[in-house]
């Protein structure tokens, strides 16, 4: 459902009578109230409550990678004083998954494929096995059931390497079973897009890619930067003697930034009014998760954050991030981070020329992670408006018909909001299609609730700007407004409607709330709380598992990757406390529950904070995890009661 006209919250059927909860427990700040009959017995007098570092959802391992994608974290996670286990994040988690014991050459995975030739020239020169009998004898036992990829497409690209091989392999004829009619029928609506072609990737890696759009843009902005830097230094010296008058004059000069002497391409239009938006989420916001969210009502999804420099250099892992499922478009955005206008311009041009299914390119101006901040990326741009504006201008002029959007925070320091000033400058000096504001500062992180009053204040600025543009548009052109989206602490339909009904706010972006409760947009549509049963929630996890295998592959390596990312997903979903066992509503995103017991064993299992139980859940769909499966939870204190 897209909200065309904002409705007062009291007009919505916020919740049915069956979901009303009497407030029989005294309110304890930060503590979720559980009905007494569902409280688990504790083994000590100390009520242990797990602590989460939710900034991890934004970093997703980026705290250990520099702008070029290289590992740069030397903190090895030592034990604290008295040998006690530390709290917080497990840095440098070893997440590499192992493959088959005998590694089969890719040309052998389909016995009927005579066209593909071994890159090494044959079995005698190849480091991989060409002996199918040997490979099948050493291969792990098949997983029970039907291959999810074969079931979806009628054909499994993993061939003999598939962990569900028995479901599409004829042992008598020693041939793979293929339903080519189904494959032809399904592939048009079930495939991945935004896959960079080999020629373009090699050109980027060898610095031979034709950046004919961004090169003049970079040169112009670089010349303007040098002039402005010299002018700024001179004005700062004058300001030290002439006082505030010169400072105000300098600000006026900055506001009258000279436009580039070339025309920006006409952009595709986006409409975010009332859109159900899933925030960019690194690691957990992967393609299978986004695909799941599309089935649960999401209108707009974003890629995981990609770094502009490695994108412009053709770095393979970085180019895996813009990939999307065909069902995500239109409405799919690629988020990038950059501290340099030249890198952002090149990344934007490369995306424009090599992808066909991108609705917007979003500049991350809010990531709080220390490493990116020190490099001048993410939230560091909030304290450097001229640099941010140069980057946006460079992207906008280089991205062809793809519009540019930004995601910001209230500011860098707590109690020092700068977004109003920043947004005014961005509106005056750039042509961003949308601005998303997370209602927290970098310093604040998730220690306090998002400031929605300030989000509304900034929304009014954007609304005034749009009205001013409409008044100035005397020719009656179809001017696309700059959309304004609020973000922070949205965990229910009440939160969503409270946000979208604020003045100047076109829509609301959901982050952690959509990880913990993936059906949140179904609640928005129904305008009431949905007490999902444990079997319904398990069905969502099964769908995620199938999507994960389709994405990463049904071979040993692909299944291990699917299991690892499913565990990452479960590290958020287990935090959901069922509506039916809560003493009062609404539930707050930052509230932590005491240890509780569900209404049945499955509900208790789904709420377990023990990562071993998460692995047990994955085994329902991905088979038994091998002894060599590696998964280390992000948080050292991963259970309510150790």
Curated annotation (Swiss-Prot):
- Active site as annotated: 367
Q: Where is the composition biased (Basic and acidic residues)?
A: 1-10, 223-254
Identify the CDD domains for this entry: DUS_like_FMN
Q: Where does it reside?
A: Cytoplasm; Nucleus
User: What terms describe the molecular function in GO for this protein?
Assistant: flavin adenine dinucleotide binding; mRNA dihydrouridine synthase activity; RNA binding; tRNA-dihydrouridine47 synthase activity; zinc ion binding
List the keywords (alphabetical).
Cytoplasm, Flavoprotein, FMN, Metal-binding, mRNA processing, NAD, NADP, Nucleus, Oxidoreductase, Repeat, tRNA processing, Zinc, Zinc-finger
- Does the record's keyword annotation contain Transmembrane? no
- Enzyme Commission designation: 1.3.1.89, 1.3.1.-
Q: Which GO terms describe its cellular component?
A: cytoplasm; nuclear periphery
Q: Which PANTHER family match?
A: TRNA-DIHYDROURIDINE(47) SYNTHASE [NAD(P)(+)]-LIKE
Protein name stated in the entry: tRNA-dihydrouridine(47) synthase [NAD(P)(+)]
The scientific name of the source species is Lodderomyces elongisporus (strain ATCC 11503 / CBS 2605 / JCM 1781 / NBRC 1676 / NRRL YB-4239) (Yeast)
Give the lineage: Eukaryota, Fungi, Dikarya, Ascomycota, Saccharomycotina
Gene designation: DUS3
